Amino acid sequence: MAQNGRFSLGVRVLALLAADAEAMQTSTTLAEALGTSPVMVRRIFGALHAAGFIQQRKGPAGGAKLKKPAKEIGLGDVYAAVGSDWPQVDEKTIDTVLKRVHQDSLKAMNETTIANVAKKLKKT
């Protein structure tokens, strides 16, 4: 899955988890709601868990739920967690500029949180 697909899926998974922050949600339930494969959701779970955004439980009563409050998870954090592919070049001057642009982009993305996204989705 392309970077923007992983990012989009990560945001949507977190927004659904935020809608009922105390409940464990299975990858199958989330996949059905999002129109994707449970395998893709589980892959995203792995990245989100590694970033400390969700907690997981295996077994019949398993699933995932938010570990960190939705208002503390910025979109830039999600982008970084799911494996951001940012261009790198050998030219030091250009690479320095690209790194600054990347940092500024993540900072701007973090102005919107998963709580903001979940709230907007609830209205629709």
Spans of model-derived segments:
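Alpha-helical residues within the helix-turn-helix
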Residues: 32, 49-50
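C-terminal regulatory/oligomerization modules of transcriptional regulators
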Residues: 90-124
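Beta-hairpin "wing" of winged helix-turn-helix
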Residues: 51-67
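A short alpha-helical element within helix-turn-helix/winged-helix DNA-binding domains
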Residues: 25-35
